Amino acid sequence: YQGQKCSAASRAYVPKTVWESMGNDLVAEVEKIKMGDASDFSNFMTAVIDGRAFDKIKGYIDRASNNPECKVITGGKCDNESGWFIEPTIILTENPNSETMVEEIFGPILTIYVYEDNAFEDALDLCDKASPYALTGSIFSSNEENIQKAYDKLRFTAGNFYINDKPTGAVVAQQPFGGARASGT
């Protein structure tokens, strides 16, 4: 779905030591994603929906590329010669309020903000206040106390909230759904 799904992950808050241990692996996995014609089933990803979406998503990548607080660490190439292809892109930002952390892109972009390990509760506040939108959200942790803190702080932040599962894991009508904010939840 090329990130064009309401439950696609578009932003992540990652503790520094976790990022140091998995950042390179994440980039390597994203770089393995094969993109091309939808009729070739060996492709995992294809074009975005139309030219308007292409222009909008490309604009986010271009602005991030020119922002000294952001760095495109993989992807970022856009090709509209035969379809509207945008590589899966990861942006690393130093600013938790940068454009791609607070706006809904609806495309193949993940922006990551790395926070100091001792700033978990501050990161939860950032998550809570980042955007008026959020159909889905996830927290990954092996620390039960942090899971509970995240649950308590973020339980009304998204319509679907996952613990140690991807945000696109929903099975319609198989879980409670509701919430607040401007996502139609």
Protein language model regions, located:
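ALDH superfamily catalytic-core signature
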Residues: 1-96, 114-129, 163
